[in-house]
Structure formats: C-alpha cells, structure tokens
C-alpha cells in the first residue's frame, strides 16, 4: 500500500493541486480574503516570539527540570511550542497580506499560494523579494513541524529525542526570522 503524502508536499510539487485546494478552501470559507491588518500581524508575530522563547527556555533548563522531576523530559512540548511559534508567524504574514485561514493546513496552503507561487522555477524561490516569496525549504520546515507537532501532541508516548526537539526549534527560529524580515519590508 502506498503511503499517503501530506498535502503540503503535493502542493510544492503540483501547482494545479495547490490552486484547486486553495480555491476549494476559499469556496468553503476556510480561507478568506480580508483587509490587511498590521495590528493583527503584530499580535501574531509577538505570540510567535513568545512561544519560541518558552520553547528555548524549556530546552535550556532541562537540567533544572530534572532536579525536580527525575528523568522527565518535555521535548514533546518543545516540538509543540516550536510549531505553534511557526504557525503564529505564518498567521502574521497572512494578516499582512490580507488573508485569514481557518485551519493549520489552510494556512500552509495560503503561504504556498501567495508566497511561493510567484515564481516559475523552484531555484528562483530561494530569494526573498518585494513580492514576498518563501523558499520551498521554508514551506517544508513548517510542514514538517506540523507533522512533528501532531506526533508530539497525539502520541501516547512522552519520550521524544532532544535532537528532534532541537531540530524543530531551529527550524522555527529560521522560519520566524524570515517572516520577521518580510514583515519589516
């Protein structure tokens, strides 16, 4: 049986699928065009940094946590917080662009459509320009973080590797910095 790929991966490879899903989300009012809102953009960017700061704090203070609760790790929550930091940064960008997305997947779809879909070749996507492009790798970062967040949130296991938590945190830091740079333009 063929393993089903996440939608965001399909969108990166197939612009027709991206366009169809984007239009379907709009028709269902999951994605709505709204007036651009810099105040809402700022609120979500502040929340992104808030979540990222606490995720960093949790990793840095793991030894202190272990003094209180022996051998307990919270790397699952680091992954969750790092993903939500990325999600709020994505929402900040959407509010600036004049979009509201009702689901996490619709948020990623809108990012792909509005920020990634402006170029003809994948190689061209690597640069940020005045048309607010995100690279394919940055879309992958939030997509992978979403998958990790789902595993960390819904898995019965509490043991997640420090390396996976730190990788998600690093992805979140890069993604949020990129969004912050875009919002400052």
Predicted regions and their residues:
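Terminal alpha-helical segments
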Residues: 1-185
